[in-house]
């Protein structure tokens, strides 16, 4: 039964396949023919559009040549053309503006380069044949789909005109309203576009006003500015600063008399009238540079990665070369400065002091006092300070590694001192003894890390060095090295007196005060004297570290020369030091009436009743003991020397110029009673007044208030801002080059040893790592190589 049905089934399948293949082929031929017809219709439509557009231009051309047009004339031919063209264009626009046009074209009209069998259609045909032996009309379905596609296109936006045609109609209507061609051209002349073109041409042809107003620099001005900016180099060659200023003034004055600065405004001219010749030259150069549009973008050595001021919190780091319990000026005065600066809420203060290993502590600190940890020494420092100032100072104390040099009798920093101030706190640096801190400094440049660096000169090193072997040669070298490091690492230098070396960027101002305890002692003694009691019951004394350079040589020479004149005058001497034995031997040799005692604090009770303090030293920069003696209401006999200039205004300060005058002043002081201090004199000696002077002369008040006053600068600030905005600063370039050369030289251990550096001070050692919990220098500053 099954075998009989098999042949009919095979023939039916074959007939179905042949029939299906024929239908697919016919359908593909029909689709291809339809695509050809559509392409021809598009081509014809484009041809007709081009032809009628050409007719439009031809018909519109005569209208523009007519000299006058009447508003009552019939509509031009182009309007009728647009009306005829509108249906075709609308159909064309609707066909191509449909958002689904491209998608539908790809779906409906995609080209079929190869004829493929639609398997789904075959499947449907087989099913259809199996059920009712019917055949699906594929052609009718395709035609129905095409009709629905065109119906969708025709149904979209029939009521809207094509955008270009609508714009064209609007322009033609506006053109019809013109009464004549004259009005047309008048409107063109008054159009906004033409006005803009005219103004642009005027601005292009106009010469810059500033370039006419500011005369160019002449040779004399260029030479004057070159000499002024070459000051650092000439200073290293030994040319004095006043000589350079005279050369600059002579060169610039000739040009100034001819020019009279006509390019400057009245406000700037008034500023020049109140300033010196250097400021006038700077502003003249700045005005020329501004007229050319030049703006200074910073120097070659400028480092912009400095402290961020966005948090409006300022930080002051005070770095010094000594620490308590060593009773020296560089240990005591920076401590008081930190305490009084911390009273202001404008800034936070950090005091950075040297940490000595135990072996060095035994050599430096008195009474065999040593510390096992930085925390223990910090506690000692704070207790000592609070006992004297009477309030709790809110500042931070940090330590950097140092080594004591017995040859130089000072502490030399070991490693990069600047690295012990975190970058987030690197805002303002105060370097106590900047030359000492930077002689062998091998590390980050202070002015690169900090926004403002102030150096305070405490010691007259040149005077000390001259007393040594080959002192003249050493002093010559040290003088230029001091100039070198001061230029390279400081923005401002304060000299406590004119006795110090005239360093670059420096001014003279006493920014030290006295311990408040001394003022209280003076007040108590003055109160006793007002009650009729005798305040001073003892004679004369001298106090200081017992080394020859601290005035002991001058003291013994004066007493020996006028031994007869000062017969009966007994002098008590308090001090410890390396030259104690030699000083005492010299006094015995001359049979001087000197009573040597161990050193003690100047505020000790045993010293309150002395009436006369004798200080013949001429090596001091500003003797702290002299200020303390004046604060206690004593007489002071001192040399007529620049180091004592600050004290001359006090009536109890008796200065002498000759050895004979010394004897006269000592007798005068012993025979009379000191004058009581006035409130103004007490304030002048106080740390409050010293801090105020420091803020003013270091320009720290301007730096701290820069953010607040930036919105409303003063006249002087505007002058400085005008100069800094345009002038390329040769000085900064020189300073950066000096700092780089110094860094290279101090990195060589052989050169360091040749110049007297303590061995092993380029980096800190293992004991410092242990005491301060530091990483080894090889890890902290690795050296990479191949």
From Swiss-Prot:
Q: Which InterPro entries match?
A: DGDG1/2, Glyco_trans_1
Where is it mostly found? plastid
Q: Which domain of life is it from?
A: Eukaryota
Subcellular localization, as worded in the UniProt entry = Plastid, Chloroplast outer membrane; Plastid outer membrane
**Per the record, what are the reactions this protein catalyses?**
a 1,2-diacyl-3-O-(beta-D-galactosyl)-sn-glycerol + UDP-alpha-D-galactose = a 1,2-diacyl-3-O-[alpha-D-galactosyl-(1->6)-beta-D-galactosyl]-sn-glycerol + UDP + H(+)
The keyword Secreted is assigned to this record: no
Q: Any idea which residues the transit peptide spans?
A: 1-25
Q: What EC identifiers does the entry list?
A: 2.4.1.241
Entry GO MF terms: digalactosyldiacylglycerol synthase activity
- Write down any Gene Ontology CC term: chloroplast outer membrane
One Gene Ontology term of the biological-process aspect is: galactolipid biosynthetic process
For this chain, the annotated S-S bridges are none
Pfam families annotated for this entry?
Glycos_transf_1
Expressing tissues: High expression in nodules infected cells, but low in nodule inner cortex and root central cylinder.
| Keywords associated with the record | Chloroplast, Glycosyltransferase, Membrane, Nodulation, Plastid, Plastid outer membrane, Transferase, Transit peptide
Question: In which family does this protein belong, per the annotation?
Answer: Belongs to the glycosyltransferase group 1 family. Glycosyltransferase 4 subfamily.
Its biological purpose: Involved in the synthesis of diacylglycerol galactolipids that are specifically found in thylakoid and in nodule peribacteroid membranes. Specific for alpha-glycosidic linkages.
List the protein's name. Answer: Digalactosyldiacylglycerol synthase 1, chloroplastic
Source organism: Lotus japonicus (Lotus corniculatus var. japonicus)
């Amino acid at each position: 039964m099954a075998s009989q049905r098999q042949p009919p089934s095979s023939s039916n399948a074959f007939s179905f396949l042949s029939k299906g293949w024929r239908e697919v082929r016919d359908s593909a031929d029909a689709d291809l023919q339809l695509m050809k017809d559509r392409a021809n219709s598009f081509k014809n439509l484009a041809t007709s559009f081009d032809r009628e557009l050409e007719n439009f231009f031809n018909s519109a051309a005569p209208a523009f040549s007519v000299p006058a047009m009447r508003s009552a004339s019939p509509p031009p031919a182009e309007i009728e053309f647009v009306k005829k063209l509108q249906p075709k264009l609308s159909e064309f626009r609707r066909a191509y503006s449909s958002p689904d046009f491209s998608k539908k074209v790809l779906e409906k009209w995609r080209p079929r380069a190869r004829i493929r069998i639609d398997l789904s259609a075959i499947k449907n045909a087989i099913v259809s044949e199996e059920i009712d032996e019917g055949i699906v009309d594929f052609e009718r379905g395709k035609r129905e789909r095409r009709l629905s596609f065109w119906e969708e296109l025709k149904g979209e936006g029939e009521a809207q005109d094509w955008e270009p045609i609508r714009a064209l109609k609007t322009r033609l209507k506006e053109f019809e309203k013109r009464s004549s061609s004259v009005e047309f051209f008048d409107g063109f002349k008054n159009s906004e576009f033409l006005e803009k073109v005219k103004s642009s041409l005027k601005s292009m042809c106009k010469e810059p006003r500033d370039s006419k107003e500011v005369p160019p620099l002449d040779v004399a001005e260029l030479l004057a500015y070159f000499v002024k900016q070459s000051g650092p180099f000439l200073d290293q060659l030994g040319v004095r600063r006043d000589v350079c200023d005279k050369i600059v003034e002579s060169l610039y004055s000739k040009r100034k008399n001819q020019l009279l600065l006509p390019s400057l405004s009245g406000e700037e001219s008034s500023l020049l009238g109140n300033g010196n010749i250097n400021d006038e030259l700077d502003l003249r150069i700045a005005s020329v540079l501004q007229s050319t549009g030049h703006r200074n973008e910073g120097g070659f050595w400028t480092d912009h990665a400095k402290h961020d001021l966005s948090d409006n919190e300022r930080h002051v780091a005070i770095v010094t070369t000594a620490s308590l319990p060593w009773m020296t000026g560089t240990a005591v005065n920076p401590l008081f400065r930190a305490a009084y600066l911390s009273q202001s809420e404008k800034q936070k203060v950090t005091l950075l002091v040297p940490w000595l290993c135990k072996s060095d502590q035994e050599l430096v600190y008195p009474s065999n006092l040593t510390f096992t940890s930085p925390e223990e020494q910090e506690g000692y420092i704070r207790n000592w300070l609070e006992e004297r100032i009477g309030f709790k100072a809110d500042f931070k104390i940090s330590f950097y590694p140092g080594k004591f040099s017995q040859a130089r009798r000072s502490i030399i920093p070991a490693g990069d001192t600047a690295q012990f101030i975190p970058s987030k706190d690197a805002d303002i640096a105060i370097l106590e003894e900047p030359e000492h801190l930077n002689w062998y400094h091998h590390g980050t440049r202070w002015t690169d890390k900090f926004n403002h660096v102030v150096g305070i000169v405490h010691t007259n090193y040149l005077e000390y060095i001259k007393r040594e072997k080959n002192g003249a040669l050493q002093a010559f070298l040290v003088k230029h090295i001091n100039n070198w490091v001061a230029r390279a690492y400081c923005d401002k230098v304060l000299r406590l007196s004119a006795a110090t070396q005239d360093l670059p960027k420096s001014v003279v101002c006493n920014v030290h005060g006295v311990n408040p305890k001394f003022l209280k002692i003076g007040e108590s003694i003055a109160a006793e004297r007002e009650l009729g009691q005798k305040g001073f019951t003892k004679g004369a004394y001298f106090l200081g570290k017992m080394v020859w350079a601290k005035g002991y040589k001058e003291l013994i020479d004066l007493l020996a020369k006028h031994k007869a004149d000062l017969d009966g005058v007994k002098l008590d001497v308090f001090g410890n030091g390396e030259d104690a034995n030699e000083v005492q031997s010299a006094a015995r040799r001359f049979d001087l009436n000197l009573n040597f005692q161990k050193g003690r604090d100047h505020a000790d009770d045993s010293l309150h009743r002395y009436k006369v303090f004798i200080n013949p030293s001429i090596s001091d920069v500003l003797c702290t003991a002299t200020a303390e003696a004046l604060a206690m209401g004593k007489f002071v006999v001192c040399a007529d020397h620049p180091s004592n200039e600050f004290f001359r205004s006090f009536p109890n300060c008796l200065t002498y110029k000759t050895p004979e005058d010394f004897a006269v002043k000592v007798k005068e002081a012993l025979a009379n009673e000191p004058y009581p201090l006035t409130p103004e004199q007490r304030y002048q000696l106080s740390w409050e007044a010293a801090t105020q002077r420091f803020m003013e002369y270091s320009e720290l008040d301007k730096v701290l208030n820069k953010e607040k006053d930036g919105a409303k600068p003063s006249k002087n600030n505007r002058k400085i801002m005008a100069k800094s905005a345009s002038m390329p600063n040769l000085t900064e370039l020189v300073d950066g080059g000096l700092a780089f050369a110094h860094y290279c030289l101090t990195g060589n251990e052989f050169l360091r040893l040749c110049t007297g550096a303590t061995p092993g001070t380029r980096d800190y050692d293992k004991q410092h790592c242990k005491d301060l919990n530091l990483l080894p220098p090889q890890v902290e500053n690795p050296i990479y190589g191949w």
